C-alpha cells in the first residue's frame, strides 16, 4: 500500500511539479487552499501533508492550527513550503506544529529526504 500525501498550494505550477515528482512513489492529492484541504480531510487521512504558507482563503498558519486541533490529524507530519525564506516564518511554522520547512524554489532531492525522514523516522535514523 502506497503512502498518501496531501499537497496544498495556490500555485498550480507548484502543485503540478509536486504531483509529477511524488506520484512515482506515493498516492498524491492536491488542493489549492487550506479550506478545500480541510474539507477533504473530513473523510480522508493522508500520511503526510505538504503545505504552502501564503495562500488565499486560509493561509498555511491557520491550516496548521486547524489540523493540529483535530484528533485524527493531530500527529500527521506537515512540511511547509514558502517563497519567503526567513527565520521568523520558519520558527512560526515550527511553533504551530510543522515538522519541516522548505523555501521555494526547493531541491526535489531535499524534499524527498524530508518526506522519507517523516514517513519512516526509525528507518531513516538507522541509516546513520
Which residues are covered by each model-predicted region?
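Two-component/phosphorelay signaling modules centered on CheY-like receiver
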Residues: 12-29
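Acidic, metal-coordinating helix/loop segments flanking the phosphotransfer/catalytic sites
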Residues: 30-48
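Receiver (REC) domain active-site loop signature in two-component systems and cognate sites
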Residues: 55
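C-terminal output helix
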Residues: 106-116
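Conserved Asp/Asn-Gly motif in the active-site loop of CheY-like receiver
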Residues: 31-35, 90, 108
Amino acid at each position: 500500500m502506497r503512502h498518501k500525501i496531501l499537497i496544498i498550494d495556490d500555485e498550480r505550477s507548484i502543485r503540478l511539479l509536486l504531483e509529477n515528482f511524488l506520484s512515482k512513489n506515493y498516492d498524491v492529492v492536491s488542493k489549492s487552499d487550506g479550506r478545500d484541504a480541510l474539507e477533504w480531510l473530513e473523510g480522508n487521512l493522508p500520511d503526510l501533508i505538504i503545505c504552502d504558507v501564503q495562500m488565499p482563503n486560509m493561509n498555511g498558519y491557520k491550516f496548521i492550527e486547524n489540523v493540529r486541533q483535530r484528533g485524527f490529524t493531530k500527529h500527521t507530519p506537515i512540511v511547509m513550503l514558502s517563497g519567503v525564506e526567513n527565520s521568523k516564518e520558519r520558527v512560526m511554522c515550527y511553533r504551530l506544529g510543522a515538522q519541516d520547512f522548505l523555501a521555494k524554489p526547493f531541491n526535489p532531492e531535499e524534499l524527498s529526504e524530508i518526506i522519507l525522514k517523516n514517513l519512516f523516522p526509525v528507518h531513516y535514523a538507522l541509516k546513520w
